[in-house]
Amino acid sequence: VTCFCRRRGCASRERHIGYCRFGNTIYRLCCRR
């Protein structure tokens, strides 16, 4: 499983499973299988 923290929406093959925070910026945690 490969996960990314993305500022915009997840790719079509990825699932949005949570959030990442870096300072004041919130990213979406997207995982691809």
Curated annotation (Swiss-Prot):
It is found in: Secreted. Its main location: secreted. One of its GO terms (biological process) is defense response to fungus. Keywords: Antibiotic, Antimicrobial, Defensin, Disulfide bond, Fungicide, Secreted. Pfam families: Defensin_1. Disulfide bonds join 3-31, 5-20, 10-30. GO terms for cellular component: extracellular region. InterPro entries: Alpha-defensin_C, Beta/alpha-defensin_C. Anti-fungal and bactericidal activity, greater against Gram-positive bacteria. Belongs to the alpha-defensin family. This is Neutrophil defensin 1. It comes from Mesocricetus auratus (Golden hamster).
